[in-house]
Amino acid sequence: FGPHITVTGPDHVQVNGRRLALKRAVTNLISNATKFATDTQITLVNGPHAADIHVDDNGPGIIPELREDAFRPFMRLDEARTQNTPGTGLGLTLARDTARAHGGDLRLSDSPLGGLRASLRLPH
């Protein structure tokens, strides 16, 4: 039946930037979460200077020591886990590059759901 996805926060957040590139960055984060987890939560936060988009999942996560490696192009951290999972290993790289090109950033941390949290921050 596929993953369960929940979205919380305001109806929309506004940021300045290239719409297609930003859409692709967010889509990459959601795609990664749903590949490895059964539950995904997307939280939008509209702060005074930036919008935050948190994508949390209940998957296996990435240990802290390997999180920076996850941003390397074509990196697939666990071949045993990813060999039957589609993807090129470029999603996180492109998402972070897009965030930084827009004056923002992308960070990975532990998720309250037990897996990984990808936090995309984009200035207004």
Task: Show which residues each predicted segment covers.
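Conserved catalytic submotifs in the C-terminal HATPase_c
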Residues: 4-13, 113
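A residue-level detector for a conserved hydrophobic packing site
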Residues: 22-23
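Short beta-strand/loop element within the Bergerat-fold HATPase_c
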Residues: 39-49
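Acidic ATP/Mg2+-coordinating residue in the GHKL
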Residues: 57
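Short conserved segment of the HATPase_c
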Residues: 62-76
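Short alpha-helical Gxxx[C/S/T] motif in the catalytic ATP-binding
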Residues: 91, 95
